[in-house]
Amino acid sequence: MTSTGLSTNKPIIKALNISNVVISNVVVANKLRNKKAPIHYNDGKLVFQTPYLTANSILVQTSTPNIYQFDTVFKGKSKKRCKELFDFIDTLESDIANKIIRNGMNWFTTSDISIKSLIRQNNDETFFIRWLLDLSSCVFIDDSKNQINPHESLDVKDLVRFIVEVKGAFVQDNKIGLAVIVHKIRVKKPEPKDKVVPEYDFDSESESDNSEEKRFVPVLETEKAPHSKNTRIIQTNQSREYDLDYNQPKNPKQTTLKNTLDTRSKNNSNTTKQIFEQDDIFSDDDNAEQLVAKISPRPERSNKSKHKIADNFGYGGFFE
């Protein structure tokens, strides 16, 4: 996908798919400019595109002129791509923080350094991103690539994808966070689900039909009592008990989400994979919103230089 402008004279910058971003090629400057460390990628800008995410709010104006915000949750057209974005942001933030710590420890006053993650968490433990937008430069387009007015066209539950530039990393008060700019947003309306209403009809016009009675009599006559107290009666349509915390069927052998997250601190390499594959938090069915709202908090991460790195401080973006 490429960014398109109103003028054909503008240079076109291709936004990378996150699967094509080589994080080891991300370079962090060793000097601060206005409390930000500039970031480059292969001697150019780090610009990537997100998969489709679900809008969880409409545009809300901030106290700064032309600056608006709205939220997206990690649910969209593809569960796999939403998981990839979650992993990408998590890995990118950790990598940049480690590079800053190695190259600029004189920027901090303590060895306890925190990450203010783009990935936030609300009171019901839903992971989401709060995007800050400068509407004087950010362009909204529809699925046909026509420019639209977001105040009129952006609704909750719309599918949205972003072209994002990681401009740098801000370093302030012993915290590190990505300074990102949203250049373009593509809005796609969710496909309506047609509800099929069945038509009902009488089986027969006659009220003297004894076929039902005749059909059930042989069944009653052949019914027998169990042979012993140990005989098991299997109820094939037995109802399942649901755990209210996760809205999933209980299974004694199933690993709980809490236990999965407890293992994350022991094995960082496979944790988000466990989180996203165990509970179908991106289900497209009617219960998807309930399921996505029950993920436990992301635990602390440790880097190689033994500095404490904690996230989820609620940083949702940066604008200039």
UniProtKB/Swiss-Prot annotation:
Region of interest called Disordered, as start-end residue ranges on this chain:
196-273
Q: Which domain of life is it from?
A: Viruses
Q: Where is the composition biased (Polar residues)?
A: 248-273
Compositionally biased residues, Basic and acidic residues: 211-226
Q: Where do Acidic residues bias regions lie?
A: 200-210
What protein name applies here? Uncharacterized protein R506
- Which source organism? Acanthamoeba polyphaga mimivirus
